[in-house]
């Protein structure tokens, strides 16, 4: 479980750093080309290392209807989330149509899978209280987590002037604590109630979010990296105990179905978090830009002082207004970023309340089915 948590976290952290380096030194095309040798190597490794270890297979009827509804519902949702911000969300007919397809497809999928004997998605796992609570916390928590993670590179590249490599480098410390302490937590979580570990994770996420929400456009890379490191303190307390809590009381094929469903919902949560928080960041930037512009008018002390200073520096009116708009845009994007970081911190604290709905369980009993 600890090793799994490290791979889950390291990938999205190393990705921006490596991707940024490749983009800066070569071209963005190589971000895709590099997957070809990696994919071939992984395929060869799996075929070689797992040879002779095939799982027991049985012939089962394929849930064609359920699979079709899953593709329609989730496919429409993913496509809508990916393009909604560019299309103006529900001002676009395409987004509305995709939303209808997603809602209808997922509702019909839920109804069908509940009564289907050979369901492609085993919804009966939700009868397990800890699975239902745990997978909900994981999905919503990962949505907030990704929202927090995605706005920082946006701010660094649009306001702070970082290139893609250095913005990835600035957020990389988020994984340091996870790599070092995930094995420690994995080996010792049988000693405490898993719920308290999850609560610790949410509390640390909230603290790291709050710290980063105090940054300014004058922040150094060290300031940013410290904030990301503090945020990363919560990662091993979140992923590992929550994964064990989800699997508590499940056995045999239930574990396979539970792992598949929880991984799918976690990925979906990340996609939702990216789409929603990028849109929120954009709209809050527009909001703050409008508010700041309202106060940047002749007659206000700050405006008059700045215009006089720029005039004495030899700038004409066009240059002065261009510089002023740039300063307003910088402050608006910064304030929008800080708003989202603060919001995610509050949401993480709210998540703590729902942890108590899960049944008390220690790590030893939770992992007994593995």
Positions of predicted regions on the chain:
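Transmembrane core module of solute transporters
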Residues: 2-5, 26-42, 65-67, 78-79, ...
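Hydrophobic/small/kink-forming positions within alpha-helical transmembrane segments
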Residues: 9, 13, 71, 176-180, ...
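Small-residue-rich alpha-helical segments with characteristic i,i+4
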Residues: 10-20, 24-25, 224-304
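Conserved kink/hinge residues within transmembrane alpha-helices of Major Facilitator Superfamily
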Residues: 16, 182-186, 355
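Hydrophobic transmembrane architecture of multi-pass small-molecule transporters
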Residues: 41, 266-360, 366-370
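Helix-loop junctions on the cytosolic side of multi-pass membrane transporters
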Residues: 44-61, 111-120, 217, 287, ...
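Short, hydrophobic transmembrane alpha-helix segments
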Residues: 83-89
């Amino acid at each position: 479980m600890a090793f799994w948590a490290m791979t889950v976290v390291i990938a999205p952290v190393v990705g921006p750093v490596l991707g940024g380096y490749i983009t800066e030194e070569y071209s963005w095309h190589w971000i895709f080309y590099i997957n070809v040798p990696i994919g071939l190597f992984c395929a060869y490794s799996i075929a070689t290392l797992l040879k002779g270890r095939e799982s027991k297979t049985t012939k089962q009827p394929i849930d064609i209807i359920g699979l079709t509804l899953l593709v329609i519902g989730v496919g429409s949702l993913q496509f809508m989330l990916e393009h909604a911000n560019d299309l103006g969300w529900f001002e676009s007919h395409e987004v509305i149509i995709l939303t209808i397809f997603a809602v209808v497809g997922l509702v019909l999928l839920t109804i069908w899978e509940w009564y289907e004997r050979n369901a492609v998605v085993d919804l009966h796992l939700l009868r397990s209280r800890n699975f239902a609570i745990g997978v909900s916390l994981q999905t919503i928590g990962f949505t907030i987590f990704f929202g927090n993670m995605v706005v920082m590179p946006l701010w660094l590249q649009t306001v702070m002037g970082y290139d893609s490599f250095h913005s990835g480098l600035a957020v990389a410390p988020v994984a340091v604590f996870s790599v070092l302490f995930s094995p420690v937590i994995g080996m010792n979580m049988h000693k405490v109630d898993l719920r308290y570990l999850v609560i610790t994770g949410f509390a640390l996420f909230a603290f790291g979010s709050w710290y980063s929400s105090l940054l300014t456009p004058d922040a150094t890379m060290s300031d940013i990296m410290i904030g990301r490191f503090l945020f990363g303190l919560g990662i091993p307390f979140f992923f590992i105990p929550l994964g064990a809590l989800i699997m508590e009381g499940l056995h045999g094929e239930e574990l396979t179905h539970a792992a598949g469903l929880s991984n799918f919902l976690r990925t979906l949560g990340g996609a939702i978090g990216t789409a929603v928080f990028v849109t929120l960041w954009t709209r809050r930037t527009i909001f703050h830009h409008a508010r700041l512009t309202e106060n940047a008018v002749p007659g206000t002390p700050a405006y008059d002082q700045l215009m006089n200073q720029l005039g004495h520096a030899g700038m004409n009116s066009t240059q002065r207004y261009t510089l002023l708009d740039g300063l307003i845009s910088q402050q608006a994007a910064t304030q929008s970023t800080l708003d989202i970081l603060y919001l995610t911190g509050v949401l993480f604290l709210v998540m703590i309340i729902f942890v108590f709905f899960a049944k008390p369980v220690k790590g030893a009993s939770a992992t007994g089915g593995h």
